[in-house]
């Protein structure tokens, strides 16, 4: 009898140790994913600003024109696809695309379109409907409102996937949302936006919803679907399908939308004859592709709420790169962020830190700070495959 009791105690102890190690592995995986997301925010911040590096020459046309912006996005998608083709190895990449024979895989294409080409169209419309006091369009406020996809993703995770967020996360999300809305209202007043611009702001919120839907849908497909796609498969299928759509219809539709012929949209590709223009856009595509790969690694490891929240760090990195470009005297004029921008952004960055540290904070509150730090860095045995 005594031997049986001792055996049961040893088995229970082994089970408890295994559960503790599994918990530590899960926490580490989430934290590592969040780090990937934070790094991806750096790349996503610099890519849009790279157009300022291109010398202002007549042959390029207006670099700020929608058709040029659409061309930039199209090349980004193509270069990102090429990067993944090389990085994941051609054979693996082709095998990823073969998954399209499964109906479930087409959901990746759908969510990719919603968070890619469709979102871009809605954002362009929101900019066109946002009118400043001079009668021109203004994309500042719509761009700020896109960041509300974080709260949409958190609410969506809670409603549809019964995800549980800690009090730290909800508090930081609520504060961030208020700050983003406050900053948007401040900019709207400062720029003297017309009341008719409310329509554009509503479209920006719809666009934010599309980004949240992409994060939620892709996360579900990678964790709970029948196939359980890897992040490599998901990001490759999403990017290549978006590249094909943008290549076929991106610039032509943008041309038609702005009163040019459908075929005029393809003429923009002639700009590749100007090497400085081409090299910068190709480099932007590689940076964007690398950032997207990190973003999807974060999505599969940490979930949609943490992933979208890491992108709030773009509020910090974008002005930092603006200051760098100003100091480097890039060919095009870069506007310096206003003083009140930082009044809103510093608390948002702090909230991003709180959300990103949530897993560690919750765990530390249960086991103590010393043990939590020890578990974060101590070497643990590899997980048994038995």
Model regions and ranges:
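Helix-helix packing/entry segments at the starts of transmembrane helices
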Residues: 75, 120, 135-148, 218-244, ...
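Glycine-/small-residue-enriched transmembrane alpha-helix faces in small-molecule transporters
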Residues: 2-74, 193-225, 278, 282, ...
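Transmembrane alpha-helices of multi-pass small-molecule transport proteins
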Residues: 2-15, 62-116, 175, 213, ...
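Juxtamembrane helix-entry segments on the extracytoplasmic side of multipass membrane proteins
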Residues: 29-34, 65-67, 100-104, 187-210, ...
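Membrane-interface helix-cap regions at the ends of transmembrane helices
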Residues: 80-101, 178-195, 242-276, 282, ...
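C-terminal transmembrane-helix exit sites in multi-pass transporters
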Residues: 61, 132-134, 149-174, 316-342
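Specific transmembrane alpha-helical segments of multi-pass solute transporters/efflux pumps
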Residues: 43-46, 92-140, 182, 282-302
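C-terminal-most transmembrane helix of multi-pass membrane proteins
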Residues: 311-386
């Amino acid at each position: 009898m005594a031997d049986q009791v001792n055996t049961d105690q040893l088995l229970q102890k082994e089970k408890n140790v295994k559960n503790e190690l599994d918990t530590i592995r899960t926490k580490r995986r989430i934290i590592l994913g969040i780090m990937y997301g934070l790094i991806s925010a750096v790349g996503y911040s610099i890519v849009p600003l790279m157009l300022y590096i291109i010398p202002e020459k007549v042959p390029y046309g207006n670099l700020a024109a929608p058709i040029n912006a659409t061309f930039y996005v199209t090349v980004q998608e193509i270069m990102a696809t090429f990067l993944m083709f090389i990085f994941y190895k051609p054979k693996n990449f082709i095998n990823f695309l073969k998954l399209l024979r499964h109906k479930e895989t087409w959901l990746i294409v759908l969510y990719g379109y919603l968070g890619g080409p469709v979102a871009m169209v809605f954002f362009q419309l929101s900019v066109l409907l946002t009118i400043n006091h001079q009668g021109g369009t203004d994309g500042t406020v719509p761009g700020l409102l896109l960041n509300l996809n974080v709260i949409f993703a958190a609410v969506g995770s809670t409603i549809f996937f019964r995800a549980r967020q800690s009090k730290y996360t909800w508090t930081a999300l609520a504060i961030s949302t208020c700050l983003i809305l406050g900053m948007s209202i401040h900019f709207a007043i400062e720029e003297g936006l017309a009341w008719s611009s409310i329509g554009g702001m509503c479209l920006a919120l719809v666009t934010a919803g599309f980004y949240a839907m992409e994060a939620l849908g892709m996360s579900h497909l990678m964790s709970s679907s029948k196939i359980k796609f890897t992040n490599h498969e998901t990001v490759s299928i999403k990017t290549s399908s978006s590249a094909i759509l943008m290549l076929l219809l991106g610039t032509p539709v943008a041309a038609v939308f702005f009163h040019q012929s459908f075929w005029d949209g393809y003429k923009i590709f002639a700009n590749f004859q100007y090497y400085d223009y081409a090299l910068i856009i190709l480099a932007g595509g590689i940076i964007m592709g690398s950032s997207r790969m990190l973003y999807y690694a974060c999505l599969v490891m940490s979930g949609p709420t943490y992933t979208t929240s890491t992108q709030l760090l773009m509020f910090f990195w974008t002005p930092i790169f603006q200051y760098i470009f100003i100091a480097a005297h890039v060919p095009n004029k870069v506007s310096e962020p206003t003083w009140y921008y930082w009044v809103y952004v510093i608390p948002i960055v702090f909230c991003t830190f709180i959300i990103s540290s949530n897993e560690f904070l919750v765990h530390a509150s249960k086991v103590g700070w010393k043990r939590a730090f020890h578990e974060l860095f101590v070497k643990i045995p590899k997980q048994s495959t038995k």
